Amino acid sequence: MQDRLHILEDLNMLYIRQMALSLEDTELQRKLDHEIRMREGACKLLAACSQREQALEATKSLLVCNSRILSYMGELQRRKEAQVLGKTSRRPSDSGPPAERSPCRGRVCISDLRIPLMWKDTEYFKNKGDLHRWAVFLLLQLGEHIQDTEMILVDRTLTDISFQSNVLFAEAGPDFELRLELYGACVEEEGALTGGPKRLATKLSSSLGRSSGRRVRASLDSAGGSGSSPILLPTPAVGGPRYHLLAHTTLTLAAVQDGFRTHDLTLASHEENPAWLPLYGSVCCRLAAQPLCLTQPTASGTLRVQQAGEMQNWAQVHGVLKGTNLFCYRQPEDADTGEEPLLTIAVNKETRVRAGELDQALGRPFTLSISNQYGDDEVTHTLQTESREALQSWMEALWQLFFDMSQWKQCCDEIMKIETPAPRKPPQALAKQGSLYHEMAIEPLDDIAAVTDILTQREGARLETPPPWLAMFTNQPALPNPCSPASVAPAPAPAWTHPLPWGRPRTFSLDAVPPDHSPRARSVAPLPPQRSPRTRGLCSKGQPRTWLQSPV
Amino acid sequence: MSYIPGQPVTAVVQRVEIHKLRQGENLILGFSIGGGIDQDPSQNPFSEDKTDKVNGWDMTMVTHDQARKRLTKRSEEVVRLLVTRQSLQKAVQQSMLS
């Protein structure tokens, strides 16, 4: 059975490679080869992993590779079909309907992804037992391109899952569909937590013979994941972590906005699933799109433009149609050097363009006119092109621009800023990720300036000798029983931080000693903490031996 | 000159206002406190930031538990602290000289 699976897998890979070769599509073939090699690498790594977190990263890579291979396969099949159909139905070149206008491509970028969680546990502060953790990441697909975010560890202290990545898709059309899938896996071993569904699989595995049965079970279980067919790409690892699809959604042009928006998530798993996370049900993100017609020039050439008020004197300019403007530069070089154009004519959704019989009266052929409405005034610019062909190509460029604007809609109102994502750093030793509180560093230095300003205004007296209150800081007891006011541990801590044992927000907590498991306060001294309240504030007879610290 | 606990003290303080953060159903401040009149100050790994008042309540003579309770009242969303630290004195001196 095992051998058969091997053979099937090899045959499938062979088939994939042959398809790519026969299509002579070197780009896609190269990408496919690359993914297949990455997949082999990920399988080997997974087999060699000892730590759970390494295994999670390797499984994630495997899942991404599998998804990519399948999507490239799908693309190959589509192209093959198109090729075959193209060959069989021959169209005469000079008849048939003109090619349909297709909209320009654009860059689509999704960033600042945040998925809110909804913990219902009212026992939050009394964390019982170990902190349950999950590893999650997002898989994003647009067309045949698949990209993934980094993997994040989630536990009860997080209010949202926030991904730092920017994901950019370079060749999207205005009819794009960006599919977003959230995958999760338990960081702890699943065995302890699952129950029912495994029993059937165990039965199956034991009846097929242990090793091959385990393989089949692993592949059957992973079939619920990225939709990979189990026989085509069986998961080689046994007992490794398994990612489950937790939620998904599809975003289209309507969701694009130069700002944050919240979208609904379709939840895909239920509470029995070991990787189930309490998702609030929405995802916030910034989805921006930059159609190429806005960022790249679509036409350029020599034009003669009628100067304002001068009927006969037409200036020769170098026109560049870019975005929603026609820039008229004095010289062709000015466009590159950043010189200001002589004239800028707006070309947007409201603009009307006409090829010109209008100016036959002036005796100038091959003209076109561009009219814009500014309030109550209509401003018309008349431009003369060099020849009939030039006029046709300018008109064509303008019609294409109008078409693109009608397709890309709100993306053409203003250019949306897209940052090229920085190359992602390889996953380092996975530290426990904290919540917002990790970033909170209260900087006292700024406030000191304000304080001293106030003091200089009010007091004015010179303080040369150290004032008596500073003695509080010298730790020299005046009485035999040393007592001091409650100290606040500063938020920005020195280098040594130890994670709290029971998952309270991990502030820069100042544990000098490995903590014990008492719920709220930790005792530094070996003696049990003296918790009896002393309302009078007088120190007790025996010397206090402890230094308690509590998070608030 | 030394500080005698139980005696009134005049000190340069800094007023700090903190809005508590919402974490699930609870409001937390996000830092830890240590010490108290019932604690041994010689074991304090830090010597900064002593709290004199919390939302009007005197903190110069409180136990660790009382301090913690005053800071974690569920009904209060904002905590106003009067805090003193050694470096305040230096800062004041520097500003006087300049």
Curated annotation (Swiss-Prot), chain B:
Phylogenetic classification of the source organism: Eukaryota, Metazoa, Chordata, Craniata, Vertebrata
Any one GO BP annotation for this protein: Wnt signaling pathway
Location within or outside the cell: Cytoplasm; Nucleus; Cell membrane
InterPro entries documented for this protein: PDZ_sf (IPR036034)
Keywords: Acetylation, Cell membrane, Cytoplasm, Membrane, Nucleus, Wnt signaling pathway
Function summary: May regulate a number of protein-protein interactions by competing for PDZ domain binding sites. Binds CTNNB1 and may thereby act as an inhibitor of the Wnt signaling pathway. Competes with LIN7A for KCNJ4 binding, and thereby promotes KCNJ4 internalization. May play a role in the Rho signaling pathway.
Protein name from the UniProt record: Tax1-binding protein 3
Domain (PDZ) ranges: 12-87
Gene Ontology terms, MF aspect: beta-catenin binding
Tissue: Detected in kidney distal convoluted tubules (at protein level).
Residues annotated as signal peptide: none
Positions of modified residues (N-acetylserine): S2
SUPFAM superfamilies: PDZ domain-like
Gene3D superfamilies in the cross-refs: 2.30.42.10
Cellular component, GO annotation: cytoplasm; nucleus; plasma membrane
